[in-house]
């Protein structure tokens, strides 16, 4: 196929097992881990875990990615849409609260096909970078119950420098508006597990508190309290972060508190992640 799925519109040739373009992946999904995951927000992980499938490859190129081994080095195992549907069944049998697809944009057609084969009875979570095209979101309409996008940057200069992502701000802003149109306001069951809605995540970068505060301004202006916002303090310099002096360290408590205070002042509903989460032990163990 000639691929223009993601906002990059590479016009690249992709076969089932190989591909050109930015992601350099074929059209068959490549996965690195399938298991209950307990590191998400409480309303996603709950007591039984989120049935998480980590996909290899990515449409971003974050220099600090903690999942660098799978996002950039593409380690993982190739599966078919049928095998992906079988993963949903196995996870559902483990009594997880939801099925959680992590970084699946570049495999969207295969993901849609897998849900035509088997649609779980539990909510579907789509965990993505926010750098998602309307084309992909239209494909997912009616399938996804909960969107879990990032909103990383307040300006495109930073997005290009650290994630190789042109027009990130405009793309993510439009994407989240479409997500909101599809799934609406947050809804919870009687156990306070999320059933519908959006949680927008923002990772605080060292030396960039201004970026974080401006991101929060963008979220407040565009979405108000129609979304939940998860403020993340788990940054660890991984991947190629050692080549960038300003981000080659963890965030300080002062940086974290400055952004958290601003988050609270703006009156967001959501979650704030403490600094002790910035530990390599929280990086998932891959199963190739």
Can you say where each PLM-predicted feature lies in the sequence?
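Hydrophobic faces of well-ordered beta-strands that scaffold small-molecule active sites
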Residues: 51, 99, 124-126, 147-149, ...
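Short low-complexity, flexible loop/linker segments enriched in glycine and/or proline
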Residues: 115-116, 140-141, 163-165, 284-288
